[in-house]
Curated annotation (Swiss-Prot):
This is Protein LemA. Its main location: membrane. Residues 87-150 form a coiled coil. It is found in: Cell membrane. It is a single-pass membrane protein. The chain crosses the membrane at residues 2-22. GO terms for cellular component: plasma membrane. It comes from Methanocaldococcus jannaschii (strain ATCC 43067 / DSM 2661 / JAL-1 / JCM 10045 / NBRC 100440). Belongs to the LemA family. Keywords: Cell membrane, Coiled coil, Membrane, Transmembrane, Transmembrane helix.
Length: 189
């Protein structure tokens, strides 16, 4: 009888340990899923930023016969295009975002100064394409920040914070933009 009782207690303890292990594995898997989702979304943002830079480059080509652009601007666009696909952190993405917005802002000023550019079909098409890319970037940024919020909340809450510490998960950075560039560039004709 005592042996049967020990076997039952042993089975109960084994089931409890198995339940805890399964729970830890499920929390770990959720962290991995969120981390991979954030990385994939950053990849989509990188692709969208590269598309934006390609469009900006085409816009510069369309506008430069009217307005003079410094060689530095063209060089900067090329540098940003090559660095965007290498960017691995939210901070690097934010820096590229900020610099490309500054360049786009300068181009928009040039377009405003030359009324004949506003009526150019090529310029209109490029501006429409840039607007679509801006919307795409905004959607990806929203998705990324939602994933990061869930990831960071899990790190802050019990019992998932124990699993996070056990496996070395650290909080992720949100994609945040400076106040003066937070608004999408206004593209209108």
């Amino acid at each position: 009888m005592l042996m049967l009782l020990l076997i039952i207690v042993g089975l109960i303890l084994a089931l409890i340990v198995l339940g805890i292990v399964i729970y830890i594995v499920s929390i770990y898997n959720r962290f991995q899923t969120l981390k991979n989702g954030a990385e994939a979304t950053l990849g989509q943002i990188r692709v969208a930023l590269k598309k934006r830079l390609d469009m900006i480059n085409q816009l510069v080509e369309a506008v430069k016969s009217y307005a003079s652009f410094e060689k530095e601007t063209l060089t900067k666009i090329t540098e940003l295009r090559s660095s965007v696909l290498k960017a691995n952190t939210a901070e690097e993405i934010q820096n590229i975002e900020r610099e490309s917005r500054n360049i786009l802002g300068n181009i928009l000023v040039a377009v405003e100064n030359y009324p004949e550019l506003k009526t150019s079909e090529t310029v209109k098409e490029l501006m429409d394409a840039i607007k679509e890319i801006e919307d795409e970037i905004a959607r990806h940024r929203y998705t990324y920040n939602n994933i990061v919020q869930e990831f960071n909340t899990k790190i802050d809450t019990f019992p998932s914070n124990i699993v996070a510490n056990l496996f070395g998960f650290r909080k992720m950075d949100y994609l945040q933009f400076e106040e003066e560039i937070y608004e999408r560039p206004k593209i209108s004709f």
